[in-house]
Amino acid sequence: MNSQNPDDHEDTTVVGFEVPVSPVSSYNNVYSSTEDETRDPPAVPPHLQHSLLGNQGSMELAYAPQNVVLNHLYIENRDAPRSVVALGFSHRFRTKFVTVVIYKPVQRRGSANV
């Protein structure tokens, strides 16, 4: 071992086990450009596109939800403004699947309803 001060373990080196010098590029963190900030967020993965809120079929065709959609809160996505909004949540209770759908009136801006 090669050391100037026996109490200083920071500068102690063992032949063959020298710490390599860090490359300068590892400390060169470039800030993100403005084009990164203007991009749209990534699309939802395909397996999260299928929720019971988007199912237009009858209740006889109801399916068991995939594991990845359980315990997620979904909101109805409509282009046209509606007077109510639907929220949905599916979870597993033992061997059954329970889906709760809540309809809430939408308060329009500027309305006098309290």
Curated annotation (Swiss-Prot):
Assigned protein family: Belongs to the 5'-AMP-activated protein kinase beta subunit family.
Species, as recorded: Arabidopsis thaliana (Mouse-ear cress)
UniProtKB keywords: Carbohydrate metabolism
Description of its domains: Kinase-interacting sequence (KIS) is specific for the alpha catalytic subunit interaction and Association with SNF1 Complex (ASC) is specific for the gamma non-catalytic regulatory subunit interaction.
One Gene Ontology term, aspect cellular component: chloroplast starch grain
Protein's name in the database: SNF1-related protein kinase regulatory subunit beta-3
InterPro entries: ASC_dom, ASC_dom_sf, KINB
Function as written in the Swiss-Prot or TrEMBL entry: Regulatory subunit of the probable trimeric SNF1-related protein kinase (SnRK) complex, which may play a role in a signal transduction cascade regulating gene expression and carbohydrate metabolism in higher plants.
Tissue specificity statement from the Swiss-Prot or TrEMBL entry: Expressed in rosette (at the protein level). Expressed in the whole plant and at the different developmental stage with a higher level in stems.
Region (Disordered): 26-50
Oligomer status and interactors: Subunit of a probable heterotrimeric complex consisting of an alpha catalytic (KIN10 or KIN11) subunit, and a beta (KINB) and a gamma (KING or SNF4) non-catalytic regulatory subunits. Interacts with KIN10, KIN11 and SNF4. Interacts with FLZ1, FLZ2, FLZ3, FLZ4, FLZ5, FLZ7, FLZ8, FLZ10, FLZ13, FLZ14, FLZ15 and FLZ16.
SMART domains listed in its UniProt record: AMPKBI
Keyword Magnesium: no
Family annotation (SUPFAM superfamilies): AMPKBI-like
An example molecular function term from Gene Ontology annotations: maltose binding
Lineage: Eukaryota, Viridiplantae, Streptophyta, Embryophyta, Tracheophyta
Region span, Association with SNF1 complex (ASC): 40-114
